[in-house]
């Protein structure tokens, strides 16, 4: 619980800094919280945080910073210089490289000078972790000099860097106290000189081309080495590194973990290694020809032979943040789910698998492979009859699959058939969730479904499937959540257009869904109402009214119009896209029941009152006058509505300012009907009533009736 609250708090602070509204100058965050805030700020701003240098300098106390794939610039250098760092991931050098080009070879970056610019004296004395992976070429002799400014460095990552002939040996001599070294995907021709690293415990050399024993013989001088990674991102049929390792007849006595995925390892070679390495505890062999070990070995084998072993492998790689390996395991799991047999793999935990896959997607958001493969895996799990879930896990599964639908344009699974199947799966899961009878928060379900509806890239069939989900669950979330779901006001126009299409196709249930959504949004978002009033979809809504036949549908549209127009009271609306020619209302005049008549009159009165200079009010005014004698004695206006009109100010505004009979008649009718149900109602508008002067006979008669009630 404490960790969850801490995450929420740090994320809020990051958003406040990003929005420029964090002003708590009296309190300086501790280093742990500062690191978390800075990390979240990087994600929110996509690395472009130089605008917030002052806030960062004033309020944060950074110790551990990792820019990952984000680009650093000179402003970043200035910020980092002010902090005492203990670990640093330097990020992409595209921006900063121009200012630190080597004087002799301007195609290279002088990393030594860049590090001196970033690291103040205190940082140099304390920095124990440095990640400078990337593809930019560094200037000559950087490996020889780096140790002079980083005396206590223990961990170094230089993945992907181009190293010249003697660079590696100089590096080992320059920083002899390293305990962790990652030289993956570098062009190291051999590891001669690694003997200088007497304290090295972890050596990561994925996809390093070492083809003969002489190129890595110095490896066996590392008597304290506990972790060795010689894996390959892609299998090559001619790779022989494990065979050469075994043929050397040498042993790393302290070795605990061997990562050899994608290599030439087989069961025979692995047996020989296990027989000679007494302390070996774990071997990773993904995409290798090994399914299991002999029973007498107690070593744990990481592979993807079964779903159970795959899940353990996934947990391991996620823990060490090995992105490519997480992708590889998820991809392999895709081929295992259709073949799942509970009799052969009865220890597999579907619920735990869902948690780990979702956690993978959350922790490594930048990987499209993890997002795509993860969604496919979850889809397979959701369709499996043997899977059993707790309600919260079920909810998380639904949300993640909805993410998959929304992101289908970015992922590599965006086929129409798959997306339809995915929607059907989501609908089935939601029914299961309903039957669990557990209270759940459906904000995220509504938010993602709403994004699917409003997003142009999502095809019509996908939107059609999102609408009933949105309509069902928008009724179960708070009014504030409804407001934020349509904060960009793109959803309602899309729903209105879909309503029009549903009417044309006579899809009764889609009409109901669309009207329910519009009702909920217009009741809870004043901004959305204002935006809708100004767009052409308002006229489409009136057109829909004219094309509908059911009284209940008429009533829903009238309520939506009332919600929109009521929110515009006292708003300075410069344009309203509503057709004041009320032919669509007049055509069905004879069919009106009392409730529809009330809402029609309310809509007309609000048009007259709110837009005196924008629309032609006379048709609306005439219709109210014409029909008023017939309906004034039968309409019953809800007192709850009347109180809204008082609180909103529309009654006061009409009684004080209006010179149109139509709106005045409506206001007096509201007062009369409400007084008949609640005598105290008139006290709310005594002054306005007494100041109302008019020569209109029909209005004078209404005033007299109200006085008689008093």
From Swiss-Prot:
<dbReference type="Pfam" id="PF25013">
    <property type="entry name" value="LRR_Zer-1"/>
</dbReference>
<protein>
    <recommendedName>
        <fullName>Gastrulation-defective protein 3</fullName>
    </recommendedName>
</protein>
<keyword id="KW-0472">Membrane</keyword>
<dbReference type="InterPro" id="IPR051341">
    <property type="entry name" value="Zyg-11_UBL_adapter"/>
</dbReference>
<keyword id="KW-0812">Transmembrane</keyword>
<dbReference type="InterPro" id="IPR056845">
    <property type="entry name" value="LRR_Zer-1"/>
</dbReference>
<dbReference type="GO" id="GO:0016020">
    <property type="term" value="C:membrane"/>
</dbReference>
<dbReference type="InterPro" id="IPR032675">
    <property type="entry name" value="LRR_dom_sf"/>
</dbReference>
<dbReference type="InterPro" id="IPR016024">
    <property type="entry name" value="ARM-type_fold"/>
</dbReference>
<keyword id="KW-1133">Transmembrane helix</keyword>
<dbReference type="GO" id="GO:0031462">
    <property type="term" value="C:Cul2-RING ubiquitin ligase complex"/>
</dbReference>
<feature type="transmembrane region" description="Helical">
    <location>
        <begin position="597"/>
        <end position="615"/>
    </location>
</feature>
């Amino acid at each position: 619980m404490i960790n969850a609250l801490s995450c929420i708090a740090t994320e809020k602070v990051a958003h406040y800094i990003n929005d420029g509204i964090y002003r708590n100058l009296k309190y300086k965050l501790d280093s742990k919280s500062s690191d978390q805030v800075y990390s979240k700020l990087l994600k929110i701003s996509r690395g472009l945080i130089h605008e917030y240098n002052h806030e960062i300098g004033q309020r944060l106390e950074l110790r551990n910073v990792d820019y990952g794939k984000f680009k650093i610039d000179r402003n970043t250098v200035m910020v980092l210089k002010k902090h005492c760092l203990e670990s640093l991931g330097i990020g992409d050098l595209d921006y900063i490289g121009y200012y630190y080009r080597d004087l002799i070879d301007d195609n290279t970056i002088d990393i030594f000078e860049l590090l001196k610019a970033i690291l103040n004296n205190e940082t140099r004395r304390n920095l124990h972790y440095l990640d400078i992976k990337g593809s930019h070429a560094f200037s000559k002799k950087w490996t020889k000099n780096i140790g002079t400014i980083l005396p206590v460095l223990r961990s170094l990552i230089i993945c992907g860097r181009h190293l010249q002939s003697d660079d590696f040996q100089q590096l080992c001599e320059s920083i002899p106290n390293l305990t962790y070294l990652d030289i993956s995907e570098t062009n190291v021709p051999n590891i001669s000189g690694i003997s200088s690293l007497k304290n090295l415990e972890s050596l990561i050399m994925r996809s390093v081309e070492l083809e003969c024993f002489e190129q890595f013989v110095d490896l066996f001088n590392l008597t304290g080495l506990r972790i060795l990674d010689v894996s390959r991102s892609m299998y090559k049929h001619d790779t022989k590194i494990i065979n050469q390792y075994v043929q050397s007849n040498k042993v790393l006595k302290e070795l605990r973990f061997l990562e050899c995925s994608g290599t030439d390892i087989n069961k025979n070679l692995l047996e020989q290694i296990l027989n000679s390495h007494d302390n070996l505890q774990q071997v990773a062999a993904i995409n290798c020809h090994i399914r299991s070990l002999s029973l007498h070995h107690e070593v744990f084998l990481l592979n993807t032979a079964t779903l159970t072993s795959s899940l353990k492998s996934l947990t391991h790689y996620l823990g060490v943040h090995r992105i490519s390996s997480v992708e590889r395991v998820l991809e392999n799991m895709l081929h295992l789910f259709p073949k799942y047999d509970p009799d052969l793999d009865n220890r597999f935990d579907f619920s735990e698998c869902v948690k780990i896959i979702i956690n993978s997607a959350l922790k490594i958001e930048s990987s499209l492979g993890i997002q795509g493969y993860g969604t496919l895996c979850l889809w397979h799990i959701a369709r499996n009859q043997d899977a059993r879930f707790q309600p919260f896990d079920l909810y998380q599964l639904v949300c993640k699959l909805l993410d998959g639908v929304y992101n289908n344009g970015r992922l590599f699974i965006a086929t129409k058939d798959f997306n339809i199947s995915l929607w059907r799966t989501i609908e089935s899961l939601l029914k299961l969730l309903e039957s669990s009878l557990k209270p759940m928060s459906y904000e995220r379900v509504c938010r993602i479904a709403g994004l699917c509806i409003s997003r142009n890239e999502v095809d019509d069939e996908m939107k059609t499937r999102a609408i009933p989900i949105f309509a069902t669950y928008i009724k179960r979330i708070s009014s504030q959540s409804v407001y934020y779901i349509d904060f960009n006001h793109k959803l309602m126009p899309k729903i209105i257009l879909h309503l029009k299409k549903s009417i044309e196709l006579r899809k009764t249930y889609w009409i109901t869904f669309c009207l329910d959504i519009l009702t909920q949004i217009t009741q809870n978002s004043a901004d959305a109402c204002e935006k809708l009033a100004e767009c052409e979809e308002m006229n489409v809504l009136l057109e829909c009214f004219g094309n509908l036949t059911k009284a209940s549908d008429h009533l829903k549209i009238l309520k939506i119009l009332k919600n929109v127009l009521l929110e515009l009271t006292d708003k300075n609306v410069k344009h309203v896209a509503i057709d004041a020619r009320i032919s669509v209302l007049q055509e069905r005049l004879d069919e009106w029941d009392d409730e529809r008549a009330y809402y029609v009159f309310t809509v007309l009165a609000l048009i007259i009152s709110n837009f005196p200079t924008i629309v032609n009010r006379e048709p609306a005014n005439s219709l109210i006058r014409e029909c008023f004698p017939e309906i004034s004695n039968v309409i019953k206006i809800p007192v709850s509505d009347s109180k809204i009109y008082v609180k909103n100010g529309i009654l006061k505004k009409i009684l004080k300012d209006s010179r149109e009979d139509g709106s005045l008649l409506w206001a007096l009718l509201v007062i009369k009907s409400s007084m008949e149900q609640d005598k105290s109602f008139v006290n709310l508008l005594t002054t306005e009533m007494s100041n109302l002067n008019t020569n209109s006979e029909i209005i004078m008669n209404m005033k007299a009736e109200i006085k008689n009630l008093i």
